[in-house]
Amino acid sequence: MRDVSLNPVRPLVTDLTNLTELAWLDDRAIAPALVTLTSGATRVVVAPEVGGALAAYYESTPEGALHWLRPATQAAFDERDPLRMASFPLFPYCNRIRDARFEFGGGTVDLSGNDLRFAHALHGNAWRHPWQVGACTESSVELHFEHTPDPQQPGDWPFRYRAQQRIELVGGALHVALSAQNLGDRPMPFGMGHHPYYPRTAQTRVYANVQRMWHADADVLPTHLGPHPAVEALRHGMSPDAFALDNNFANWSREATIAWPDEHRQLTMTADTPFDHLVVFAPANDAQLCVEPVTNTTDCFNAVDMQEQVGGCVLEPGEEIAATLTWTPRKG
């Protein structure tokens, strides 16, 4: 059952036909139930049923929607695909786990079989399920997801936990507070993050103060931490076309800026600890660009002897963790 507790002036909507605010979609579009947050001219469209994802974050202007994140397409709604939303939450780990298995608590955690599209477990399980809607105002909404292991489902995450997002507009800035609690009676390995996609143009630049990069193999799994020309490029404003990247970066300052200098605007993302790791996904000859704040590197659960370098943590029974991400736009 979905728990819907909404301000009447901000109802969940399913028929987008008359919503001119969502004009980037076809005027005949039908989407899952959405929540639209407003603050002045800024809008955030949330798709609870599509993995608790953000569908869009934009400013409404006389010329149309000015998007700060890549907006979801109609196909993303049709297929309920979080991977094609504007951003989606990552619980209870970020990125890949090699061969979908790792050792923990004296046994093997086998996550294989839950998604045959991927050879390695990917992004946890919260993005694969609908989220419940909690308290909602004109400018904020709370989303909740609770996972109980299903022994009959191959590759199901074998630990019980609760996750929450509080998504809020403050002025033009977007705040996403993420939290989780171990609801089980045994320790649980854990990590979290968000997976934002940004508009990518020929003039886009990414700024981030990072120290080293995790080099990766053909399966995009980390092999070693070391120098790379992208480290220096990010400090001075890296073009997404400069390298073919799908890599973790270490020791970032928890601040990154995506700039569109030809459009005279930029978006700065800041993160609380323990979002101490940064992923940059900028594939060659592709329109995608992600700059992702995460608490753990790829395959961290299989690198138990490198905890300080790979992040992640273990939540004891009943233990909670919380941290906030903020995106602040600027024009001019």
Stretches found by the model and what they are:
Residues 4-116, 254-275, 319-330:
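Beta-strand-rich N-terminal accessory domains
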Residues 9-12, 16, 187-189, 196-273:
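Active-site/ligand-binding surface loops and adjacent short beta/alpha elements
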Residues 24-25, 29, 38, 103, ...:
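Extended, loop-rich substrate-binding clefts of extracytoplasmic carbohydrate-active enzymes
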Residues 35, 44, 141, 174-176, ...:
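Hydrophobic residues embedded in beta-strands of well-ordered beta-sheets
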Residues 37, 44, 48, 147-190, ...:
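Acidic, contiguous internal or C-terminal segments within carbohydrate-active enzymes
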Residues 42, 120-134, 205-206, 234-311:
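Acidic/His-leaning functional-site neighborhoods
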Residues 66-84, 109-130, 207-229, 288, ...:
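Glycine-rich, pocket-lining loop/helix-strand segments that form or immediately flank
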Residues 310-321:
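Intrinsically disordered, low-complexity Pro/Gly/Ser/Thr-rich segments with frequent PxxP/GP/PP motifs
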